[in-house]
Amino acid sequence: MKPCAIVLLSGGLDSATALAMAREAGFACHALSLDYGQRHTAELAAAARLAAQLGAVEHRVIRLGLGDFGGSALTDASIAVPESPVAGIPVTYVPARNTVMLALALAWAEVLGARDIFIGVNAVDYSGYPDCRPEFIEAFERMANLATKAGVEGAQLRIHAPLQHLSKAEIIHRGTALGVDYAQTVSCYQADAEGRACGRCDACRLRREGFLAAGLADPTRYAR
């Protein structure tokens, strides 16, 4: 019987690759997505497609209104999504999003008896979010083992971030080898209802540059 793992699945390029890698590692993957009030809801439809295509045992979508707090261009329509690189942490950072998602994954893992959680964060070709850094992942794993019944009873809980030190091109090559159909993923911060990308935001830039560096055709559909 395969061991269970929780895989955080946004519907984007990175999380799809993380799911494929977890499956390749021999886990029965339970995919978890978060409907947090993001403007790019097309990624949730993409997550459902990817969970099915990549053999997830189960896919759940948790609704949690982080958008009620605002504070991010991804949850507040009055804040424009930047279309050029900015210094510092950009307004597309969603406060505590990865912390909340990992906490939900941890709760589900305890219920299922899973000891492994996968998250597709990256600290090489990324937008500079503080909750994508290795220090954060390491700290959350320590907390998980202190704050759970499983951890206190001696079961080692592990937070896997297999993409953390890979370039976007390396991620794309890895996922392609594992059968990820990147045409089904949505990365754009302001994708339209059909999942077509704007081609101008930071997520689109990183994705486009990644395919270019990988020497592979970019399957992204653009709105214009």
Curated annotation (Swiss-Prot):
**Chain positions recorded as ATP binding sites:** L9, S10, G11, G12, L13, D14, S15, A16, T17, A18, L19
Recorded hits in InterPro entries, A to Z, give:
QueC (IPR018317), Rossmann-like_a/b/a_fold (IPR014729)
**Residues binding Zn(2+):** C188, C198, C201, C204
Provide the reaction this enzyme catalyses.
Answer: 7-carboxy-7-deazaguanine + NH4(+) + ATP = 7-cyano-7-deazaguanine + ADP + phosphate + H2O + H(+)
The main enzyme category here is ligase
Q: Which UniProt keywords apply?
A: ATP-binding, Ligase, Metal-binding, Nucleotide-binding, Queuosine biosynthesis, Zinc
Record text on cofactor binding: Binds 1 zinc ion per subunit.
Q: Name one Pfam family in it.
A: QueC
Q: Pathway of this protein?
A: Purine metabolism; 7-cyano-7-deazaguanine biosynthesis
Gene Ontology molecular functions? ATP binding; ligase activity, forming carbon-nitrogen bonds; zinc ion binding
Q: What cofactor does this protein call for?
A: Zn(2+)
Q: A GO biological process this protein is involved in?
A: queuosine biosynthetic process
Q: What is its EC number?
A: 6.3.4.20
Family that this chain belongs to? Belongs to the QueC family.
- Known function: Catalyzes the ATP-dependent conversion of 7-carboxy-7-deazaguanine (CDG) to 7-cyano-7-deazaguanine (preQ(0)).
**UniProt-recorded name of the protein:** 7-cyano-7-deazaguanine synthase
| Origin species | Thiobacillus denitrificans (strain ATCC 25259 / T1)
